[in-house]
Amino acid sequence: MNSIVSTVRGILTLSRSETFDSPRDEAKSDLKVLSVAWNQVCSGFIVGTNHGFNVYSCKPMIKKSISRAPHESGFKVAEMLFLSNLFAFVGNGYNNSEYPPNKVFVWDDYRNCCLSELTFKSEVIAVKLAREHVVVVLKQNIYVYTFNNLKVDRVIETLMNPKGLCCVTHVESKAVLACPGFHPGQVQVHDLRWNVIKFIKAHDSAIACMTLTLDGSLLATASTKGTLIRIFNAVDGTLLQEFRRGVERAEIYNVAISSNLKWVAASSEKGTLHVFRLRPDILSFDPASSSSFIRVILPKYLYENERSFAQFSLPASTKFIVGFGSENTVLLVGIDGSFRRCKFDHADGGQMVELEHKYFFSLQETGNTMVGGV
């Protein structure tokens, strides 16, 4: 069985040899990172280890205490709902058979209890939490539960999905879910309230990662080829913008869209974080307008495949997930136990400046202030 690193919109799979020991802390020399995931707005992240899970806030970068959640078992999947008291986790099955890899535990840390145990016939690959739903991803099925009663709302079929790719919206006004379709390169977008499904042919090769904006209006995707990142209107499937990460194949770990809809970031195995600029009129873009006429006249390379606006170099040997912080800042969490905060020039771009670099296992635990907030 593999260990995994979970991004906020998908999963990166690690072999057991790729799990990372806790650095710079001899007292915790046996602690290993099994999974890392942002919360829904990148204001915090959760780390699954071989001894329970840890929760961290990004504003500022501090460790939060968890009252009675299990600490003697390994969790290959750990997810949090904003900075609330609600969590979901899946055991890796190595340390303790009480937490097998085919069972999801929904934990309320305020009540110090497990709200529900969701058991499946096969291994759970990923879990996603939203205000209204708990989403459980298996290799070829996705189970959507209503959060208030934890009953199955629907089951979605996909092609083989070993990375557990899935993303959901996190605003009260919409309930949208995106996941792989039935063919390589295809994405299916579900409006969970109106039972509307849209299939988008995003790439020729298989999907490597995807993300939705908080309101479900935009969808960003990258394929296993790893050269292009595409932005779609999630409602009608229109291709709105295309970015080029590079010309060589690469594994893209995850993609993030800033909350102000100005920037897109991507991390990959090449060791460079790329930030791209979204078109200012991205949501009002009409492919039938005069710009489409320009697209016909100009060579394709002048209109599409826009290069990155800002960059930051990272250790190529470490997998990172990326998210956006405050204005013009990017947050990075690595499976080596590192946290970075970087800033880019919104006018000129270029090389980013590192503002903060810490190892989160070395942080002291603070009081339990998880209830409420984002």
Swiss-Prot record:
Q: What is known of its domains?
A: The first protein part may form a beta-propeller domain involved in specific binding to phosphatidylinositol 3,5-bisphosphate (PIP2), leading to the association of the protein to the membrane.
Per the record, the coiled-coil ranges are: none
Family the UniProt entry places it in: Belongs to the WD repeat PROPPIN family.
Q: How does it assemble?
A: Component of the PI(3,5)P2 regulatory complex at least composed of ATG18, SAC/FIG4, FAB1 and VAC14.
User: Matching InterPro entries, A to Z?
Assistant: PROPPIN (IPR048720), WD40/YVTN_repeat-like_dom_sf (IPR015943), WD40_repeat_dom_sf (IPR036322), WD40_rpt (IPR001680)
Annotated WD repeats reside at 28-66, 72-117, 202-242, 247-286
Its biological purpose: The PI(3,5)P2 regulatory complex regulates both the synthesis and turnover of phosphatidylinositol 3,5-bisphosphate (PtdIns(3,5)P2). Required for autophagy.
Please give, as recorded in its UniProt entry, the membrane topology of this protein: Peripheral membrane protein
**SMART domains assigned:** WD40
- GO terms (BP aspect): autophagy; protein transport
Q: Where in the cell is it found?
A: Preautophagosomal structure membrane; Vacuole membrane
Supply the alphabetized keyword list: Autophagy, Membrane, Protein transport, Repeat, Transport, Vacuole, WD repeat
Q: Any keyword Membrane?
A: yes
Which residues does UniProt assign to the signal peptide? Answer: none
Q: What is this protein called?
A: Autophagy-related protein 18e
Gene Ontology CC entries for this record: phagophore assembly site membrane; vacuolar membrane
